[in-house]
């Protein structure tokens, strides 16, 4: 029984359509109806928009995020009508709900369209500081500086002033050209909180523009007050810029102590020590108090720099692995660099994998690569009998200018073809990918006729060799890609793809390849056209993990982290593609074996995807229970297995393998 027959025989599970809950009570129905009418008037009054010069602005694109945090874009007018206004109406009587909606609109440069919501919020919110700053911000962003000024002048007094209100008031004063008054208000904010980042910067920016000596004098006075760690930190930076490391270090140490070794001061101190090569001080005053749970990614990277200088590869690898559990994906390249660096140190120091004469090997398959790390689910394979012609698929060559993308495509394109040929055809083929030690091997030279003849001599029944060349053109993001079939009997070459792609259309090479193969072999299989490279370029790193040792995988945390993040994005942008979802589940299980620390951060989105039915297709619903096994959620795992009520022995045997570990 093949995957298709098995899925057809599974019981269909009816989906319950979620019903939208009704809004809050009808106590203020008449009032709310009038308010909604005002919002509709704002949305639909096109003549008013045209008079204000905002009509064409409706067709600019606005970014928004769905329930999974996936970014989408739509015309501003559509966003207003479909997203913003419905959200405002829903939260009209809920100030804690209305506040982030208005803030989000402000972040998108949307102001006049939320005027009624701002006024409503100001009238109803019980948080004085919050509503004052919101209305003041609205006036400021719409150019009504005088209105903002009057708002603060009339409502602020010694009894209700706060740090935030002082700063907001001062910012308006600056915009109105009243710099001396703004300076005093920023100072008032510092008297409330001497370590306020915004007030400190804006106050001293004004002072420094006026006179550098005055800046240093006032900084000195503030730094002498106990508890003013920000002033001490800034004064330390002044000393270091002047080359006075001793005085600078004195103030850094005190800033660290007074701040409780907080994240900001630890980052600044560690950066200064690394920049000035003060490694003993780094060890004594940073490393001794460093806590990756408390301190930020920048401090972690500085600690890794220190480990690199001191050749502490064990500590470096340990920190890379530990920090991979944090949501610092934007720093993945830097952490990957250190992982690779420390791994190479480990290999060299411990004489691991040091056979310099190791020859190339071949990973040979006609199965999708996720199969191997997913407990070999035979029932998920296409069990159709394979028939001639017999085809060998080779890794493509990467020639011309050195290119990371070209080398990736040289491996990823054959792997992508492999996955499609396996499920969509009965073609008898075999993919062979060369590797050396734990690295994929991509030839820098075209395959010769003699090489093709040698392959034929070793495979008497072989009909075709499918190969290709990816040439990165010099000094431009263009790629000349040739993919061909070599007829081993007639010793003739048939071109499948021969085209120059640029960075905007190179994604289409995968579509062109499938079309050409389908036409040549007269298989006429369905093609799911891709619109980007996101999915394609993940094949190469997945295979690289497959050929690596377990101990190496354990120290590839950041590569796994990036791969998992990308795979989730791929599923969310193509939610009807079951193969991409299977790849995600297989990757989650693979990660559990060597880097389980990565799973916790992604658990909410994985569970949410399951709740929203992304894994509820005929194919995926029998795999979804594995999610709960991966997260050690035995209650939900057993409940899902019982609900499926599948008695097929192949499936049950596979499921049991996850419990045997």
PLM feature spans:
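TPR-adjacent "capping" and linker segments in tetratricopeptide-repeat scaffold/adaptor proteins
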Residues: 80-97, 121-125, 220-225, 381-386, ...
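Catalytic-center loop of serine/cysteine hydrolases
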Residues: 440-546
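Register position in tetratricopeptide repeats
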Residues: 107, 141-142, 175-176, 208-210, ...
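Short beta-strand->alpha-helix linker/helix-N-cap micro-motif
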Residues: 386-459, 463-475, 494
């Amino acid at each position: 029984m093949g995957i298709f027959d098995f899925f057809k025989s599974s019981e269909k599970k009816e989906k319950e359509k979620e019903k939208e809950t009704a809004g809050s009570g009808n106590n203020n129905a008449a009032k709310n109806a009038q308010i909604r009418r005002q919002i509709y008037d704002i949305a639909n009054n096109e003549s008013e928009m045209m008079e204000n010069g905002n009509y064409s602005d409706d067709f600019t694109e606005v970014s928004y995020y769905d329930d999974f945090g996936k970014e989408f874009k739509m015309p501003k007018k559509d966003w207003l009508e479909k997203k913003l206004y419905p959200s405002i109406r829903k939260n009209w009587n809920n100030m804690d709900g209305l506040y982030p909606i208005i803030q989000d609109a402000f972040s998108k440069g949307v102001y006049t369209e939320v005027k009624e919501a701002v006024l409503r919020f100001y009238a109803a919110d019980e948080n004085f500081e919050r509503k004052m700053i919101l209305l003041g911000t609205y006036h400021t962003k719409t150019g009504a500086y005088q209105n903002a000024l009057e708002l603060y002048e009339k409502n602020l007094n010694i009894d209700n002033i706060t740090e935030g209100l002082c700063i907001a008031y001062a910012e308006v004063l600056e915009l109105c050209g009243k710099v001396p008054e703004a300076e005093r208000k920023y100072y008032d904010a510092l008297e409330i909180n001497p370590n306020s980042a915004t007030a400190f910067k804006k106050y001293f920016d004004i002072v420094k523009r006026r006179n550098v000596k005055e800046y240093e004098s006032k900084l000195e006075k503030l730094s002498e007050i106990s508890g003013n760690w920000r002033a001490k930190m800034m004064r330390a930076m002044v000393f270091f810029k002047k080359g006075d490391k001793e005085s600078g270090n004195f103030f850094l140490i005190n800033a660290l102590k007074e701040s409780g070794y907080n994240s900001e001061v630890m980052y600044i101190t560690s950066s200064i020590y690394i920049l000035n090569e003060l490694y003993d001080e780094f060890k004594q005053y940073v490393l001794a108090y460093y806590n990756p749970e408390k301190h930020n990614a920048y401090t972690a990277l500085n600690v890794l720099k220190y480990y690199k200088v001191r050749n502490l590869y064990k500590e470096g690898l340990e920190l890379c692995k530990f920090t991979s559990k944090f949501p610092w994906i934007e720093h993945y390249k830097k952490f990957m660099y250190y992982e690779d660096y420390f791994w190479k140190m480990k290999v060299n120091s411990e004489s691991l994998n040091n056979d310099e004469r190791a020859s190339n090997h071949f990973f040979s398959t006609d199965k999708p690569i996720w199969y191997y790390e997913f407990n070999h689910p035979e029932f998920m394979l296409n069990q159709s009998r394979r028939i001639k012609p017999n085809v060998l698929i080779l890794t493509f060559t990467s020639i011309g200018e050195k290119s990371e993308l070209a080398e990736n495509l040289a491996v990823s394109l054959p792997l992508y073809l492999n996955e499609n040929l396996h499920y969509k055809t009965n073609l008898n083929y075999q993919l062979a990918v060369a590797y050396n030690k734990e690295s994929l091997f991509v030839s820098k030279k075209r395959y010769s006729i003699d090489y093709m003849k040698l392959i034929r001599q070793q495979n008497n029944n072989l009909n075709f060799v499918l190969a290709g060349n990816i040439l990165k053109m010099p000094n431009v993001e263009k790629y000349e890609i040739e993919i061909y079939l070599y007829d081993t009997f007639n010793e003739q070459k048939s071109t499948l793809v021969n085209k120059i792609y640029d960075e905007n259309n190179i994604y289409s090479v995968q579509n062109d390849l499938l079309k050409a193969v389908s036409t040549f072999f007269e298989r006429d299989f369905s093609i799911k056209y891709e619109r980007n490279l996101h999915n394609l370029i993940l094949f190469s790193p997945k295979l690289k993990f497959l050929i690596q040792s377990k101990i190496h995988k354990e120290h590839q945390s950041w590569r796994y982290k990036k791969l998992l993040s990308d795979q989730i994005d791929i599923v969310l942008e193509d939610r009807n593609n079951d193969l991409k979802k299977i790849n995600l589940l297989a990757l989650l299980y693979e990660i559990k074996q060597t880097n389980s620390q990565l799973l916790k951060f992604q658990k909410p989105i994985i569970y949410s995807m399951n709740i929203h039915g992304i894994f509820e297709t005929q194919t995926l619903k029998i795999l979804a229970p594995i999610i709960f096994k991966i997260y050690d959620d035995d209650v939900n795992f057993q409940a899902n297995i019982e609900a499926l009520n599948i008695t097929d022995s192949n499936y049950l045997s596979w499921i049991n393998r996850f419990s045997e570990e």
